[in-house]
Design a protein with these regions (language model features):
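Short, acidic, Ser/Thr-enriched surface-loop or helix-capping motifs
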Residues: 6-7, 36
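A short, polar/charged loop-to-alpha-helix boundary motif
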Residues: 51-63
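Short loop/turn motifs at secondary-structure junctions and domain boundaries
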Residues: 23-26
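A short acidic/small-residue loop/turn micro-motif
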Residues: 20, 48-51
Length: 69
């Protein structure tokens, strides 16, 4: 699993597995899930992250697990 955070877009992406995205399912206004053609979840995208998670907590993600930008 990899996590990336784009400060400019204020978006966090959690990579769960590699593969080609067949569709993106909108769970909420700020939460999207990428799915392959077999129905496997490839990744989760959170939009407007700083509205949901305090910026100091976003920083902890980087210190507690590998994060790739």
């Amino acid at each position: 699993m990899k996590i990336s955070y784009d400060k400019i877009a204020d978006a966090l992406y959690i990579y769960l597995r590699s593969g080609k995205v067949a569709k993106t399912k909108k769970i909420t206004k700020r939460l999207l899930v990428d799915i392959d053609k077999k129905g496997n979840v490839l990744g989760i995208e959170m939009l407007e992250v700083s509205r949901q998670i305090p910026k100091k907590e976003i920083g902890k993600i980087y210190s507690e697990m590998p994060v790739y930008a």
